[in-house]
Structures are given as structure tokens and as C-alpha cells.
Curated annotation (Swiss-Prot):
Entry's family note: Belongs to the universal ribosomal protein uL18 family.
A molecular-function term among this protein's GO annotations: 5S rRNA binding
Pfam family for this entry, one: Ribosomal_L18p
Keywords, comma-separated and alphabetical: Ribonucleoprotein, Ribosomal protein, RNA-binding, rRNA-binding
The protein's assembly and partners: Part of the 50S ribosomal subunit; part of the 5S rRNA/L5/L18/L25 subcomplex. Contacts the 5S and 23S rRNAs.
A biological process term (GO) from this entry: translation
Protein name: Large ribosomal subunit protein uL18
NCBIfam families assigned to the protein according to its UniProt record, in alphabetical order: L18_bact
Gene: rplR
SUPFAM superfamilies the UniProt entry points to: Translational machinery components
One Gene Ontology cellular component: cytosolic large ribosomal subunit
Key word Zinc present: no
Function: This is one of the proteins that bind and probably mediate the attachment of the 5S RNA into the large ribosomal subunit, where it forms part of the central protuberance.
Length: 118
């Protein structure tokens, strides 16, 4: 039986997360969620089950930008700055099943430029 688009997306995200768990070596995960109108990023410590830092296009300067590449880059910069304040510099990038292109790539590049290593 064919999977619905939603079920396919959930499976892709789970497959990505399983691979990341094997590669992470205890590093926190920079998780990205992309909707049609916003983009969200969280730095998550999976061992403790705690979100260390987060940012989205719903807050601050990014709220006026919408969900384009510029807004995604701003979110990447914000989440990187907040993670570094908490003492986190090394993370594993969890693209959540999304293709590494466009807004997801812009967020990742901005986070790298702001000082996160992945």
C-alpha cells in the first residue's frame, strides 16, 4: 500500500534522525522544521531531552521577514548565537528529511558563519 505524503515525510525524518543518533557522539542536534509560512530551529540535547536554544521566524527581526531565505539565514544566526551563549559550539545538523537546499541550506550556512561547527 502506498504511503501518504505525510507518512513519507515522517519516515524520512525518522530515518535521518536514526542515522544522526549513530554519528552524534553525544553532541546536541540542530533540528530544523520548515512550514510554508515559517521556519524553526532548535538545538536539542537528546541525552537529557532538553532544548538548549531555539529561534524562529515568529520572533524578533525575523517576524517581519516572512519565510524566505533571508529570514532563514537570520534564524540560523540567532539560534547559533543563543547556543554559543549556552556553551554549545559543536552540533549535528538534523535537516529533518528536508532537502539540503534553499531555506534549509541558508539556515545552516548562517549558523556555521555565526560559529556553530557541524
Amino acid at each position: 500500500m502506498a504511503l501518504s505524503p505525510r507518512e513519507s515525510a515522517v519516515r524520512r525524518a525518522q530515518r535521518t534522525r536514526t542515522r544522526l543518533k549513530a554519528l552524534s557522539n553525544g553532541r546536541p542536534r540542530l533540528s530544523v522544521f520548515r512550514s510554508s509560512k515559517n521556519i524553526y530551529a532548535q538545538v536539542i540535547d537528546d541525552e537529557r531531552g532538553v532544548t538548549l536554544a531555539s529561534a524562529s521566524t515568529l520572533e524578533g527581526e525575523a517576524a517581519t521577514k516572512g519565510a524566505d531565505k533571508d529570514a532563514a539565514a537570520l534564524v540560523g544566526k540567532l539560534v547559533a548565537e543563543r547556543a554559543i551563549e549556552k556553551g554549545v559550539k559543536d552540533v549535528v545538523f538534523d535537516r529533518g528529511g528536508y532537502i539540503f537546499h534553499g531555506r534549509v541550506k541558508a539556515l545552516a550556512d548562517a549558523a556555521r558563519e555565526a560559529g556553530l561547527n557541524f
